[in-house]
Amino acid sequence: MKVVSLFSGIGGIELGLHQSGHTTEIFCEVDPLAKAVLSKNFPGVKIEDDINEIRELPSCDLVAAGFPCQDLSQAGGKEGIDGSRSGLVKKLFELIEKKEHANRPPWILIENVPYMLRLNRGKAMSYLTSVLSELGYTWAYRTVDARCFGLPQRRHRVILLASLFEDPKDVIFSQDHSEPDLDGKPSVVDHSNYYGFYWTEGLRGVGWAREAVPPIKCGSSVGIASPPAVWSPYEDIVGTINIRDAERLQGFPEDWTNITTETGKDIKEGARWRLVGNAVSVRVSKWIGENLSQPKGSISDFEGELVTKTWPSAAWGYGDKKYKVPVSKWVANTEQIAISEFLNHPLKPLSARALNGFLGRAARCTNVNYSDEFINSLERCKDRQLQKV
């Protein structure tokens, strides 16, 4: 398929589609650093600067749009689908509406965060699905955990696929696997495992993950990186992962974002974390691309319970019909790679200040029961860091 990419970021959707036999005809990305990453890794493909400057949607088989999540995420401003950033997806529909029905792109692929299913009672999903139906598309969406492809990062994202002439259920609901209980709780630890967590949190939650890391974030609004930490009980060490391992956790090759800026300087690490944290998992889009090339058929017609008040984790619809779909977040069941075996680069030890901040928050936390072994190990790590000063 020929792909037109909007809100391209660093090309996570497109790399996965390329790996499954599809080609990108044009990118559209406003961020200068993301554009530089695209230029480096997709040489020769045209890059438009701003979706607001596009007057006509080029002819294609599929439009990919991982539109901005800042207004829809739990950590963002929560302005919703009418926010200045997430609301840019409306431009996509304006471009499609300009075309005659028969000339509209046969497929539309949209990606965003699961929180949009709950924010403002799911107003964003209500908007997306209603507009797609008005434009003549049948749609299906599913929340997918990228960890099901074997990479040790827990990452849930909503994948919305719409088709003008075919049935998107044959792509989105062609596989389903039970979700394993992988992560356990911070109150119980095993010496043989590594544990991932958010060292910047600790007061209300920690993102605990056994032999994996919680979702890679894009960092702060001022470009300060906040990579997840990994703790090894056996080695009695705790540190943050390397940006090159973070790229691999997202399905990219190492140094995908290692570019030279327009000023001739090397890109700052905080900027790389932002780019990688905002990216779509390559493994997820590769799965979609493979199923688009060879649809396996939906495991059921799913014409049972209708969507009523709240949006479920998966659904499909056409016209004014919206059906719940009882499937898991695991579309594959690839053998899991432990984070202890996955990392190519050493952990960067957390500073005494960072550890002290986390330990202080953990001490005040009332809804997470941290094991004494975890807390005591972090105290020892802090003491060793202080001795170095």
Curated annotation (Swiss-Prot):
Enzyme Commission number(s): 2.1.1.37
Gene deletion effect: Essential for growth, it can be disrupted once one of the components of the corresponding BsuMI restriction endonuclease complex (AC O34303, O34885, O35025, YdjA, YdiS and YdiR respectively) has been disrupted. Triple deletions ydiO-ydiP-ydiR, ydiO-ydiP-ydiS and ydiO-ydiP-ydjA lead to loss of susceptibility to MspJI, which only digests C-methylated DNA.
Influence of temperature on activity: Rapidly loses activity at 37 degrees Celsius in the absence of DNA.
Reaction(s) the record says it catalyses: a 2'-deoxycytidine in DNA + S-adenosyl-L-methionine = a 5-methyl-2'-deoxycytidine in DNA + S-adenosyl-L-homocysteine + H(+)
Induction: Constitutively expressed during exponential growth. Encoded in an operon with ydiO and in a second with groES, groEL, ydiM and ydiN. This second operon is heat-inducible.
Enzyme class, broadest EC rank: transferase
Reported regulation of activity: Somewhat inhibited by MgCl(2) and spermidine, strongly inhibited by MnCl(2).
One function term, GO molecular function aspect: site-specific DNA-methyltransferase (adenine-specific) activity
pH-linked activity: Optimum pH is 8.0.
Domain of life, source organism: Bacteria
Keyword Protein biosynthesis attached: no
Residues at the active site: C69
GO biological process: DNA restriction-modification system; methylation
Keywords assigned: Methyltransferase, Restriction system, S-adenosyl-L-methionine, Transferase
Domain SAM-dependent MTase C5-type intervals: 1-299
Pfam families named in the record: DNA_methylase (PF00145)
SUBUNIT field: Monomer. May form a complex with YdiP, also seems to be active alone.
PANTHER family per record: CYTOSINE-SPECIFIC METHYLTRANSFERASE, DNA (CYTOSINE-5)-METHYLTRANSFERASE CMT3
Family: Belongs to the class I-like SAM-binding methyltransferase superfamily. C5-methyltransferase family.
The protein, known as: Type II methyltransferase M2.BsuMI
Organism: Bacillus subtilis (strain 168)
